[in-house]
Amino acid sequence: MKTRHWSVLSLLALPALSQAEAITGEVHRQPLNIEAIVMFVLFVGATLYITYWASKRTRSRGDYYTAGGRITGFQNGLAIAGDFMSAASFLGISALVYTSGYDGLIYSIGFLIGWPIILFLIAERLRNLGRYTFADVASYRLKQRPIRTLSACGSLVVVALYLIAQMVGAGKLIELLFGLNYHVAVVLVGILMVMYVLFGGMLATTWVQIIKAVLLLAGASFMALMVMKSVNFNFNTLFSEAVKVHPKGLSIMSPGGLVSDPISALSLGLALMFGTAGLPHILMRFFTVSDAKEARKSVFYATGFIGYFYILTFIIGFGAILLVGPNPAFKDAAGALLGGNNMAAVHLADAVGGSFFLGFISAVAFATILAVVAGLTLAGASAVSHDLYASVIKKGKANERDELKVSKITVVVLGFVAIGLGILFEKQNIAFMVGLAFSIAASCNFPIIFISMYWEKLTTRGAMIGGWLGLLTAVILMILGPTIWVTILGHAKPIYPYEYPALFSMIVAFVGIWFFSITDNSEEGQQERLRFKAQFVRSQTGLGASQSSSH
């Protein structure tokens, strides 16, 4: 039960981040899928043309980091959805609904909870105070160098963990869907990722994410429509027929079958809720619009698209119970689903649309990976070039050309690192990295951004000590927990008994920031508190905020 519980949680631990959890363990390679490969080549061709087009329009630092602030709220909402909806969500949640029914809906709603937090607490102030990265906001009235160093470290750790999970997941997913070799798949994803970001910057990344979101929503909508058509558009029929054919019977309509440990569940819930508001590649998207109003619209549209997508995955999961489960064509000799339960949605695509639509859905799953890794790579590169190189090493005196050069070098380095780690971690269950990435985002990035915008008494000392404590607590508790301490390191019992650290590491971060700020009586601390009023005015009004013209 414990292993199953972990595998389910890890499967879903991140929508935006990881096909890895959707495809953990051994992969059964499928036959070469010609339709899928043709459609994927068409997608790559189209996106490479977009990259060429974007490269002609990417001239300045602002163009490269934020597409010059010229993306509209609607476009950005679609791009955020494209950045957030992963193959893990599409395959993983529909697979969870296929195996466990109603519990799948609970998990998918969990992913949505973080967006109202971003809408009401983060989006407008972030856009008014920042320019290229969230470190601009965190360091607005505090000491630039230490805060930017901490923010960049938090960003890079999250990006690195996500990238490893993405690359391993990408290799396994492509091996599973296309029949391609794992190493070939990882290298292919790495090369395409570098090309998008290196030449097209944020503009190319945005349009890759928009196209991917449209394709994924269109494909999932068609699948859900065909499922509903098969039951005459009657939900009662869908559910009652599913109950009849599912091995678990009526229990698939009840919640609570997956979570045996409430502390781990609460910790995961907190990480999902608040970690979303600390993901660097998501936060960076708010600087691509012209003002706070468009930033707010972005979240509104993104929430709508993401919510709609999770409703579709629920219908797709029940459709798979009905149309895939009883069909022997999709089973092996032992009666198990071909390719594993994570293939439920892919088999449903075959059942409702034939081999052509199966090829389309397989290609969309690959496109999903490319869109997510491109956003991650750009976020990592900007943390190095803008926060570490320009602001810390050069103390704000770097010229634009050098900063862009550093950013592009970082993109290439990240590409090599991602490919290398993807190959290195091929046989590992890398699901714990995803939980750790979200926990770090919730324990380090989110507290600093949130408190810097809302609490007048915050000082550099408090932010630094509390932020580092949150980050280190999350990492240490994860190492001492059951996944690493027992499963990987081979000890008999875990020192920290729960799966996720966010419940405790967030408390450590917030208490640390509060305590070390209120006990800071230095002159610098007093000055930082006095600068809050000017920050508050700008965060509310946008007066003095960087406009697209200044990018």
UniProtKB/Swiss-Prot annotation:
CDD domains registered for this protein in UniProt: SLC5sbd_u4
Primary localization class, coarse: membrane
Short name of any one Pfam family annotated for the protein: SSF
InterPro entries per record: Cation/Ac_symporter_ActP, Na/Glc_symporter_sf, Na/solute_symporter, Na/solute_symporter_CS, Sodium:Solute_Symporter
Gene3D superfamilies reported for this sequence: Sodium/glucose cotransporter (1.20.1730.10)
GO CC annotation, single: plasma membrane
Location of the protein in the cell: Cell inner membrane
Membrane topology: Multi-pass membrane protein
Transmembrane annotation, as ranges: 34-54, 77-97, 104-124, 150-170, 184-204, 207-227, 263-283, 304-324, 356-376, 406-426, 430-450, 469-489, 498-518
Alphabetically ordered keywords of this record: Cell inner membrane, Cell membrane, Ion transport, Membrane, Sodium, Sodium transport, Symport, Transmembrane, Transmembrane helix, Transport
PROSITE patterns registered for this protein in UniProt: NA_SOLUT_SYMP_1, NA_SOLUT_SYMP_2, NA_SOLUT_SYMP_3
Biological process terms in GO annotation: plasma membrane acetate transport; sodium ion transport
Purpose: Transports acetate.
Protein name from the UniProt record: Cation/acetate symporter ActP
Native organism: Yersinia enterocolitica serotype O:8 / biotype 1B (strain NCTC 13174 / 8081)
